[in-house]
């Protein structure tokens, strides 16, 4: 009887979508049953936000706490944004409509100055997610890079971007989420551009 500490960072348990596919509902039912079984064991839970904590604690009878993200990124000294050739970066998940928001930012940058490039780094292996950038001359998709390199590139950026999707399904899926890169961006002292609903 070793206690379990569950890390709950998203709303997958409660989040359902409309589907006529019986396999979706079979999966969802099996998933929920497994989660209830795991959460019935002695232990606790940690959450990424107070909203998701309250939802799970109330529904499951848990006594979990919100954890607050910290970062090991070194803070850079304040410097004005280099308007001639700014380093503009995004690090993280490009699913849930974030890719389309990043693409919007890329096109907006191109209208400001065709030389401005948004560098996007993500572990996405889904061509439907990163493929939206292929016709955008102001977005460079760099794929996966090690976390140490994320920290280094972030610290050397003029602007780092945090985005969310705008479609109702994207908003619904991320309503209890918090960008895990937010702590790094805030700690870095880099200028932050946020774009979301």
Task: Give short role names for the model-derived ranges.
Residues 40-41, 46-47, 52-72:
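Helix-loop-beta element that forms the nucleotide-linked donor phosphate-binding surface
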Residues 97-100, 148-152, 160-186, 192-197:
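Nucleotide-sugar-dependent
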Residues 12, 25-45:
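Membrane-proximal helix-turn-helix segments that form the acceptor-binding/catalytic region
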Residues 71-132, 140-150:
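Conserved catalytic-core segment of nucleotide-activated headgroup transferases in glycan assembly
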Residues 3, 44, 117, 158, ...:
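Proline-centered loop/turn at the N-terminus of a beta-strand
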Residues 50-53, 122-128, 197:
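Short, polar loop motifs at secondary-structure junctions
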């Amino acid at each position: 009887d070793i206690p379990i500490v569950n890390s709950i960072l998203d709303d997958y348990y409660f989040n359902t979508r409309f589907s006529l596919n019986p396999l979706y509902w079979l999966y969802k039912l099996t998933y929920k049953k497994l989660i209830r079984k795991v959460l019935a064991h002695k232990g606790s839970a940690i959450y990424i936000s107070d909203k998701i904590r309250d939802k799970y604690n109330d529904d499951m009878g848990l006594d979990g706490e919100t954890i607050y993200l910290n970062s090991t990124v070194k803070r850079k000294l304040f410097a004005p944004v280099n308007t001639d050739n700014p380093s503009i970066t995004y690090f993280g998940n490009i699913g849930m409509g974030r890719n389309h928001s990043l693409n919007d930012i890329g096109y907006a940058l191109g209208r400001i100055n065709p030389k401005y490039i948004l560098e996007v780094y993500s572990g996405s292996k889904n061509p439907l997610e990163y493929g939206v950038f292929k016709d955008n001359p102001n977005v460079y998709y760099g794929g996966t890079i090690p976390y140490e390199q994320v920290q280094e590139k972030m610290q050397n950026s003029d602007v780092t971007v945090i985005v969310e999707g705008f479609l109702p399904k994207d908003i619904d899926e991320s309503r209890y989420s918090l960008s895990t890169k937010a702590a790094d961006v805030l700690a870095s002292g880099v200028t932050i551009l946020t774009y979301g609903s």
